[in-house]
Amino acid sequence: HIITSAGVVLASYYRYRHRPAALASFLAGWLIDVDHVVDYVSAHGWKLNWARFSEAKHEHYSGKLYLPLHSFELLALFFLFFKGPRRQPYRVGITLSILTHLILDQRCNPSRKPLTYFLAHRIRKRFDAAQILGVPIGEPALEST
C-alpha cells in the first residue's frame, strides 16, 4: 500500500503543489490498516504475537471480520463532507489513496466478496466472517519461519 500511496502522492502533488495534502494522502493510504488492530485484539487479545499479527487472518481465530476503516461508505462520507476550495487537495488525494487501498485489497484477497468492503454489509452480517466471506472459517495453521 505504501507504493500505491506514493503514486497517488506524486499525482496529487503534481496537480495541486500542496505538500501537507500530499503527505496526508500518503499517510491515509496505508494508515487505514491500523484498523487491523481491532480484528487482531478480537482474535488474540492484547498480547502481541508478530507471526499471528502479520498473517492477517484474524477472522479465522475470532470468527469476526470488523475492519471498521475499510469502508466504501466512510470514504463516500469523507468525500461528500470534506468540501471547499482550500480542502480540495486533501479531498482528492486522500479519497484516491483510500480508494486505491480498498480496490487493491479487494483484488489481492480473492476470498473477499464484492460486498466485503461495505461496512453496512458487515454490520448486517453481524461481522460474522463466514457469512461475509461466504466460506467456512477455521483456525489456520501458522507457518514456521
List the model feature ranges, each with a label.
Residues 1-145:
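N-terminal membrane-targeting hydrophobic helices
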